[in-house]
Amino acid sequence: MNDIKQLLWNGELNVLVSIDPSFLMKGSPREIAVLRIRVPRETYLVNYMPLIWNKIKSFLSFDPLTDSEKYFWFEHNKTPIPWNYPVGVLFDCLAGKSATFTTSFENQVKDVLTFLRIHLVMGDSLPPTIIPIASSKTQAEKFWFHQWKQVCFILNGSSKAIMSLSVNEARKFWGSVITRNFQDFIEISNKISSSRPRHIPLIIQTSRTSGTFRISQPTISMTGVNPTLKDIEGDILDVKEGINGNDVMVICQGIEIPWHMLLYDLYSKLRSFDGFLYITLVPIKGGDKASSEL
């Protein structure tokens, strides 16, 4: 199982970051406004903000680290996107709303998104539901650790396991994300995980035709059961809208997942670096209800 986890851990995406002209002084070279980077699927976009600021610092029209009157966020095709989801999760959802797929997800994304294209913008106020990009170097770490507290509680019924980590273990845990140390990550995360979870930390994301994300976090009990995805289809899909499993593909970590997959097996193998299992629902061509409602 660790072989699968390490493949996911080592997975990377091409990310093209374009900088809004409002950040730069007049006369700045056009090429300075575009940055191409390779980013792990299992990280946050904001972890690369120091790299972005460093590239454009000589051409900035203001100091973003001290300006408290401006808010910064990312967009894709003029739609705000949250930095607080793993990069791979964002890619899966953005690829999913770029087309309606008729063949395998893996083949289609090659044509739809060669790069994860994001735009760094700023404004006097934030779009709804978007967490601003802060100058604090600990912003991502604090958010990520809070995610793991939630995960620990969902799995075990309490946060005792993660709160019992020593200061050095907690630093080592986050450090494993920054330095890409897989062994350290597995060592610490296994202390939090449970072989007999009470519930599964699950987040479902779907792209609406408006370009916004629909996020749900169903509560899936695992007490005495180990359901398949098909068994919990009603929790995964918005059945009130008449959508069923024939209308959508289930995508996790860029992989198309069959409905007969056991939920605990899926969680054990494909959970993300923040402890949650992210499932992306992608409309299938011919699924009229999915195409109109998602």
Curated annotation (Swiss-Prot):
A Pfam family per the record: ATG5_UblB
One MF term in the entry's GO annotations: cargo receptor ligand activity
GO cellular component: Atg12-Atg5-Atg16 complex; autophagosome; cytosol; membrane; nucleus; phagophore; phagophore assembly site; phagophore assembly site membrane
UniProt KW Metal-binding keyword: no
Induction: Translation is induced by nitrogen starvation. Translational repression during nutrient-rich conditions is dependent on 4 uORFs (upstream open reading frames) present in the 5'-UTR of the mRNA; these promote ribosome dissociation. Translational induction occurs in conditions reducing translation machinery efficiency, leading to ribosomes scanning over the uORFs (leaky-scanning), and increased translation of the mRNA.
Chief place of localization: membrane
Glycyl lysine isopeptide (Lys-Gly) (interchain with G-Cter in ATG12) crosslink site(s): 149
Gene3D superfamilies: 3.10.20.620, Autophagy protein Apg5, helix rich domain (1.10.246.190), Phosphatidylinositol 3-kinase Catalytic Subunit, Chain A, domain 1 (3.10.20.90)
Key words of the record: Autophagy, Hydrolase, Isopeptide bond, Membrane, Protein transport, Transport, Ubl conjugation
Location of the protein in the cell: Preautophagosomal structure membrane
Keyword Protein transport: yes
Gene Ontology BP terms: aggrephagy; autophagosome assembly; cellular response to nitrogen starvation; cellular response to potassium ion starvation; cytoplasm to vacuole targeting by the Cvt pathway; macroautophagy; mitophagy; nucleophagy
Tree of life domain: Eukaryota
Membrane topology summary: Peripheral membrane protein
Post-translation changes: Conjugated to ATG12; which is essential for autophagy. Conjugation with ATG12 involves ATG7 as an E1-like activating enzyme and ATG10 as an E2-like conjugating enzyme.
Anything else known: Present with 606 molecules/cell in log phase SD medium. Small amount of ATG5-ATG12 conjugate is enough to perform normal autophagy.
Its biological purpose: Involved in cytoplasm to vacuole transport (Cvt) and autophagic vesicle formation. Autophagy is essential for maintenance of amino acid levels and protein synthesis under nitrogen starvation. Required for selective autophagic degradation of the nucleus (nucleophagy). Also required for mitophagy, which eliminates defective or superfluous mitochondria in order to fulfill cellular energy requirements and prevent excess ROS production.
Quaternary assembly: Conjugated with ATG12. The ATG5-ATG12 conjugate forms a complex with several units of ATG16. The ATG12-ATG5 conjugate also associates with ATG3.
Family note: Belongs to the ATG5 family.
Protein name, entry field: Autophagy protein 5
Species for this entry: Saccharomyces cerevisiae (strain ATCC 204508 / S288c)
Source species taxonomy: Eukaryota, Fungi, Dikarya, Ascomycota, Saccharomycotina
